[in-house]
Amino acid sequence: MSRVYNFSAGPAVMPEEVLREASEEMMDYRGCGMSVMEMSHRSKDFQDILKEAEQDLRDLMEIPDNYKVLFIQGGGHMQFAMVPMNLMKNRVGDYIITGQWAKKAFKEAQMYGTAHAIASSEDKTFSYIPDCSDLPVDEDADYVYICLNNTIYGTRFPELPNTKGKILVADVSSCFLSEPLDVPKFGIIWGGVQKNVGPAGMAIAIVREDLITEDVLPGTPTMLRYKTYADNDSLYNTPPTYCIYICGKVFKWLKNQGGLAAMKEKNERKAKLLYDFLDESQLFKGTVEKQDRSLMNVPFVTGSEEMDAKFIKEAKEAGFVNLKGHRTVGGMRASIYNAMPEEGVAKLVEFMREFERKNS
């Protein structure tokens, strides 16, 4: 069977070059006679993989020396807890609620202290990003938390919020490495890797060194302290070795693509193809305010659940898979992450155009 165009929100499409390389090295990694899956995490071979992956990520994002790169098991939901556990010195966190993942992080933080929702777009089903130029930031807030790109609803922050000097924490899971970020503007940048970077099972946290301390909430487990990972180069326990290996290959692939500035240009071209069609279509409609549209996740609807279901079924038969919207919102969603080729988006638009012609 030939490969399909996979528009899944995560786990998601991977660069074919990376998959081929991993396949070639599956039984014998660079002459060592074993798979990376079989390696000791204390071996020189794996430690070289880890160091190279970190350095390539630092190069791609231009991460300053006063930030630690941490490879952490557990994914995004664990970061919802780790952020307040490690940062809530005053037991206060301010949250900008722009979707379900920010809302879940907000609810998790309420278990550890006072969490304020200082802005929200829930009034219009998270179809826009609220004005963040003059937020009611609490003077005692330990940080301001955002989800930079909203996977379910297809919005992204067009510019960073004014945090009035407070630490900015960002969940970048679904836009990780899709465009350059000014790292020094953040205290913590974290992302689950399963959307745009690698296989499921890990998050990467980029944490400013002064925020990594022993001063965490009482009762914080060893494995939920950023310091545990920072002090041990992410090797306190057995890390997700194969996941790190694949992420490292993705970092090299991104470098070979020209880096994050080049990737942003490519992603803008892909998104424009799809949004331009949605704006002219009489059948399909986008669901997000134009100025806040995501480059990564594009939700759309026909206005009829029956027609949506027909489209999803016929698209799958034509080789365009995982276009069904999130279970909480319905409709359709095309996730067009870094590894989705421009050809894939162009062919999807062609299919949508033909579907509209047949069903108008």
Where are these regions (language model features)?
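PLP-dependent enzyme catalytic core of the Aspartate aminotransferase-like
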Residues: 2-4, 317, 326, 330-360
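A glycine-/small-polar-enriched, mobile loop at the entrance of the PLP active site in fold-type I
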Residues: 3-54
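Active-site C-terminal subdomain of aminotransferase-like
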Residues: 15, 193-275, 289, 358-360
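Conserved N-terminal alpha-helix of the aminotransferase class I/II PLP-enzyme fold
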Residues: 32-79, 86, 100, 108
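Conserved PLP-anchoring active-site segment centered on the Schiff-base-forming lysine
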Residues: 88-103
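Active-site phosphate-binding strand-loop segment of PLP-dependent enzymes
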Residues: 109, 121-176
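Conserved active-site segment immediately N-terminal to the catalytic lysine
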Residues: 169, 183-194, 203
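Conserved PLP-binding catalytic core of the aspartate aminotransferase-like
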Residues: 284-315
